């Protein structure tokens, strides 16, 4: 986070997620998340990204509100991440998040790729008109589909990894592996040209307002 602060004009949002797997968190998990929010602030982050659900798939409003209030006290922006795509009803989830004071949610419309969830994303956008909650479309967003996605969904923002696979220059191949998944000898890096193309494509179309009165 500190290194990223050296790039002017680039807002830094830190992911707050204590473990992999689902988004049903224990009291201990929540305590770790609270500490991570404070650490993100101390490191210079502009905001944090988190998401918590109940066992039945509803938004965990009590825990989310607790973290949101902490963020407000620390003057940190906060976004609800793609946990919304694992919720039992993404449309109702964003309505709940808007009422809880969230100003941004990242979603693929409950599908692996945003292009497949475009209809649900549109319903989510329509459901929170006038609340100030901004819907950010993400997952599989590329320079060649970002315009269509923003137009079809009415989403206010887009998120893309713009990543490319890079081969390692490490020639020795030991018999052990240290990767949880995939190969030890490939990694993903951000592709600068993809980023430029994505930004240019998105900037070329009129932006919808947040709908806040």
Indicate residue ranges for each PLM-predicted region.
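Short, flexible active-site-adjacent loop segments at beta-strand->alpha-helix junctions, enriched
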Residues: 16-20, 54, 84, 111, ...
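Active-site beta->alpha loop and helix N-cap motifs at the rims of alpha/beta catalytic domains
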Residues: 1-62
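Glycine-rich phosphate-binding active-site loops on the catalytic face of alpha/beta enzymes
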Residues: 39-55, 102-115, 153-176, 185
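Long hydrophobic alpha-helical segments typical of transmembrane helices together
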Residues: 149-213
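Alpha-helix-loop-beta-strand connector modules within alpha/beta enzyme cores
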Residues: 1-20, 59-82, 118-143, 180-208
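Catalytic cores of alpha/beta
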Residues: 21-39, 85-100, 124-131, 137, ...
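Generic structural signal for helix capping and beta-alpha/helix-loop junctions
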Residues: 22, 57, 87-88, 114-115, ...
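Catalytic beta/alpha-barrel core
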Residues: 46-61, 77-88, 93-94, 103-115, ...
């Amino acid at each position: 986070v500190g290194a990223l602060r050296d790039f002017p004009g680039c807002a830094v949002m830190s992911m707050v997620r204590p473990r992999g797997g689902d988004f049903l968190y224990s009291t201990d998990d929540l305590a770790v998340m609270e500490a991570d929010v404070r650490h993100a602030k101390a490191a210079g982050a502009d905001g944090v990204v988190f998401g918590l659900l109940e066992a039945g798939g509803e938004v965990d409003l009590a825990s989310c509100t607790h973290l949101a209030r902490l963020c407000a006290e620390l003057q940190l922006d906060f976004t609800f991440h793609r946990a919304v795509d694992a919720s039992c009803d993404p449309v109702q989830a964003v309505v709940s998040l808007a009422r809880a004071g969230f100003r941004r949610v990242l979603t693929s419309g409950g599908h692996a790729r945003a292009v497949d969830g475009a209809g649900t994303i549109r319903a989510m956008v329509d459901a929170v008109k006038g609340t100030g909650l901004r819907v950010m479309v993400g997952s599989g967003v590329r320079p060649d589909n970002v315009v269509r996605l923003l137009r079809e969904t009415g989403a206010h923002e887009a998120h893309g990894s713009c990543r490319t696979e890079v081969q390692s220059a490490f020639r020795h191949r030991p018999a052990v592996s240290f990767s949880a998944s995939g190969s030890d000898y490939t990694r993903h890096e951000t592709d600068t040209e993809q980023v430029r193309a994505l930004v240019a494509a998105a900037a070329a179309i009129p932006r919808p307002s947040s709908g806040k009165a």
